[in-house]
Amino acid sequence: MKSWVSIVLICTLFYSFRYKMDERVVAQAYIERYSVLAVNEMRRSGVPASIKLAQAMVESNAGRSVLALESNNHFGIKCKSYWKGQSYYHKDDDLDAKGKLMESCFRAYADIDASFKDHSDFLRSSAKYASLFNLDITDYKSWAYGLKECGYATDRSYSLKLIRTIEEYQLYRYDTYLSSEFDLPAYQALTSQIVPIQSTID
């Protein structure tokens, strides 16, 4: 009996380890693909590259969510009354009069670049996020907590998820590339060398 329990435990640990490794491979590929875009948007808009990448990874499950795959929306941004672009309807957290989940209107984009750009413009153009741009661009923790306080997400642990992601994948390194002139080969080398580490958040 003990040997059977041991086998089950070993198998469980193995598959758990394998799953975590697979998740990290997917996450790292996502970072390598979109980090330059995030840095360019940081230089254009002032939104930290670490925050943008972390939000995109959390909101889109590193590009694998239905919303990301079907509408190129990597930040979970809903339509709002003033949105004039394409839309995609998907059940999220909006409830109807009977308290049942109803389809929410999300913004849809022609490509992922447009999603990253609109995320910057969405934050820059809204008065409720204005205070974020008074923060130091390298202060990712204050940005993470500020986004939650400003109402970006309803998830109570949203800030901690962003911070964990930033620290595990060392996304804060990208916030140092604010200058319009930087060594692109060195930057790309940095991207390929980043190895996931343990977050300081429990």
Which role does the model predict for each range below?
Residues 2-3, 13-202:
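Catalytic cores of secreted/periplasmic lytic hydrolases that degrade extracellular macromolecules
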